[in-house]
């Protein structure tokens, strides 16, 4: 037996029923005061801590809570505030904090992008002229709160300095170390205050260590953590990595810290190999992330216990920590909120609270022997077996179709240069055609009507009539705005992935399986629990109805396989590429149904393509090849004059531009406005032969852009892209915006387009 310690790395902020989201939005809407917001969120925070305490977690994280984002928290802790927000140098107010994230009338929001290869977004630090100083030791506040209110000796959590700076913008390789030298004493101040307050442990997250980087950068980590160790020798620092294995295992485990946190789930088996090959320092704790913190499936506890027993052979007794692979921020709170799920599926699930229980079971099994938790192990064993052996995961028709993929055509009949002429011939669009990305605002009335329908308070006929009325209203709005290619608005959809999950076999929606995407925006990823199959038309009815209302083309709107995969909780018993191809075959039937019913412009969105890239570049090519294959599997069977669109967002594209072209979509739209033109520079350096729309304004902020701002974005793009290839559109879908600001922004977009179009037509003459 091995003496082990249980630990957690972070807990979901949302609350079991999204109470955190509602509190934030009430504050933003002015219906509660700041004092009330602080009171409501404190209740949620303490409830989360108490649950972890009650479930037997020894090292409970504190300071993982945030009002928006942990990276933004780090920025305001150290006073890294963009000048446009006119910060006075004191402690950052909550209003300024939210302005940085959301923007305000006279200041655009800071850029937002994906947290490594997850669907969580962070606010990008703006590091130009950064002079860090501690304005607010949030970690100390949360540590003292947990101690005072609950008697919890918590483990404060910080985003590590190197990861923080690597995630920022405004510094280059030359200035990086100079900037790092400025941050070290600021971090030391935080750590000294924690040590003085009695903190025993602090968790410093450095997921950058799990990426691919130059080995010379290890010296930066040695410098930082030696400074910390010297400054706070009595504070146990857990240097936490996650999302991948360590390229420089030997160097990392010998850094001057008390504990090293390693992901043993998303490491492709590399970590245990490194441990066997190189051992582990006797004086350090190994925090083994063995419970999957990014997916919702129940752990095979027998396999996890076997792995932990193997790990324990290389770790000094009493120095093995059992924990999730990463923060539980990325999974829903509890499966106890899902009593209506199929019994076999429910049995196979493990949300945040259940993962804490798995950690406790494994810790007890190591410390007291497996027989001490024999009943718990048997229950888990039976549940995992029942799901794997169920008919859900053994659909012979689907498995036969996958086996015969070599017989399925995955290329369009004509090359782009030839088929685009056929598309232009019937579309007859002007220079710089305008469109939107898909969704329009889901007003309180839309959400209430859907909720009433789901509760059975209104009939299917009443609900469908409402959706048609709202669709017709927005078709008229788009025509009045003079948009060229229309959309139906997606009023029937809660989410661009969940909606498809409700219509395809092998998917299961949840009621309260919410996770944070950005700010108060929560998504409810469907569960892909079994083999995926087409069972009914998904989008045809709404698309055909919308097209019947107008002579302008209306886009059919689908979500592509890789985005569905990346924004779902995917079964973990088969490779993701197999699931993506199952989804591709199912969606191919939907694309064909749209085309059969007269929809000749079909958008197949792949916004999450880049975010799913493996952190190790050596693994990129297979992922990208698989992504291209599943996309073409979805789209390749259409006629040559049917125009395929796709959309991507939150992405750096310079390193995957060949993949984007290989998708062979006729038109791609890309989010660009929040990156302030950086993506445009990619197209200044490469030749892209298909049509493209670079988003001309940021939809994530309530701020309405000016005509001049939009024109500046258009003109900048036209320096890189041929005018005849260029489309004009917002960055992303408009579902989360309010109607007045949406219409105002689109009016500005159309006005800006017409003025620039007129300029170009004069030049052509």
Swiss-Prot record:
InterPro entries in the cross-refs: Cbl-indep_Met_Synth_N, Cobalamin-indep_Met_synthase, Met_Synth_C/arc, UROD/MetE-like_sf
Key words, A-Z: Amino-acid biosynthesis, Metal-binding, Methionine biosynthesis, Methyltransferase, Repeat, Transferase, Zinc
GO BP terms in the entry: methionine biosynthetic process; methylation
Pathway: Amino-acid biosynthesis; L-methionine biosynthesis via de novo pathway; L-methionine from L-homocysteine (MetE route): step 1/1
Positions with a binding annotation for L-methionine: 437-439, 490, 605
GO molecular function, one term: 5-methyltetrahydropteroyltriglutamate-homocysteine S-methyltransferase activity
Free-text comment on the cofactor: Binds 1 zinc ion per subunit.
Active site: 700 (proton donor)
Pfam families per the UniProt record, alphabetical: Meth_synt_1, Meth_synt_2
Cofactor (UniProt): Zn(2+)
Functional note: Catalyzes the transfer of a methyl group from 5-methyltetrahydrofolate to homocysteine resulting in methionine formation.
HAMAP family the record matches: Meth_synth
Family: Belongs to the vitamin-B12 independent methionine synthase family.
Protein name according to UniProt: 5-methyltetrahydropteroyltriglutamate--homocysteine methyltransferase
Organism expressing this protein natively: Listeria monocytogenes serotype 4b (strain CLIP80459)
Name of encoding gene: metE
